[in-house]
Amino acid sequence: MFKKYSIFIAALTAFLLVAGCSSNQSSTDSEKKVTLTISAAASAQDALEEIQKNYEKDHQHITIQDNYGSSGALQKQISQGAGADLFFSAAEDKFKKLVDDGDIAKKDSTELVGNEIVLVVPKNGDSPVTSFSNLAESEKIALGTPESVPAGAYGKESLTKLSLWDKVKDKIVYGKDVRQVLSYVETGNVDAGVVYKTDALVSKKVNIVDEAKADTHSPIVYPLGIVKDTKHRKEAKEFYEYLQSDEAMKVFEKYGFTAE
C-alpha cells in the first residue's frame, strides 16, 4: 500500500513539475522579443518616434523599426514584397492601391490623422517671398516630386488653384520627400518651399509665411493599415489600436496633426 502511495506521489510530483515548466515556457513564449516594422511617411517621423518611445516603455518585448520615405516609394516597396507590418501613408491614393491589390485588408485600415500645407522661407535669409501671392518673385522653390511625394501633389494642386503653377514651375527644385524639401529651405538653397505644417513646426530654421486654404487642394488624410503578410499580426494589431488611442492622438496633435 505504501509502495503504491509512493509511486502515486512521485507521479504527481513529476506531473506538476512538467506542468510548471510548460506554464513557464508558455509565459516566456508570450513575451518573446518581437520587432515590428512600420513603413511611414517622412512627415510623420517626429510624432511617431515619440509615440513609439512611449509604447516600447510599456511593452518591453516590442521593438519598433521605422522605414521612413515618400508614401509613393513605400507603397511600391510593399507591393514588391518588402517586409512591413504596418503602413502609415500621407496619401490616400497610394494606400488605396495596396487595399485594392489585397496587400492591406480594408477592415485592418483607418483614416488616422490629417495635415495642412504651408509655405515656408529660410528663417535667417532674405527671401522676397511673404505669401503665396508673391511666390513668383522667388528664384528657386522647393517642392516634393508630385508623382511620389503627397505633399508635392497637394502643393501642386494649391499652386494650380491659385493660378501660380505656370508662373513658378520652371523655378521648382524637386525633393524625394518632404524632409528633403524642408532641408533645401533650411540651408537657404531655395527662397521658399511647400511642406506640411507638421514639418515646418519642428524646424527652427524656417518661418511659415502662408497656409494653403483647404479648398485649394484635396483633403489631406493619413491612412494607417496592417499589412496582410505581417508575421506578427497580434503585435501589429495591438500597436495599430494604440496609434488610435487618446494617448497617441495627443502626441499627434502636439506635432500639428489634426484628428480625423
Swiss-Prot record:
Gene3D superfamilies: Periplasmic binding protein-like II (3.40.190.10). A lipid is attached at residue 21 (N-palmitoyl cysteine). The keyword Cell membrane applies. Molybdate binds at residues 43, 71, 151, 178, 196. It holds the Pfam family SBP_bac_11. NCBIfam families: modA (TIGR01256). InterPro entries: ModA, ModA/WtpA, YvgL-like_PBP2. Residues 1-20 form the signal peptide. Keywords: Cell membrane, Lipoprotein, Membrane, Metal-binding, Molybdenum, Palmitate, Signal, Tungsten. It comes from the Bacteria. Belongs to the bacterial solute-binding protein ModA family. It is found in: Cell membrane. It is a lipid-anchor. It comes from Bacillus subtilis (strain 168). One of its GO terms (molecular function) is metal ion binding. One of its GO terms (cellular component) is plasma membrane. PANTHER family: MOLYBDATE-BINDING PERIPLASMIC PROTEIN, SULFATE-BINDING PROTEIN. This is Putative ABC transporter substrate-binding lipoprotein YvgL. A lipid is attached at residue 21 (S-diacylglycerol cysteine). CDD domains: PBP2_YvgL_like. The keyword ATP-binding does not apply. One of its GO terms (biological process) is molybdate ion transport.
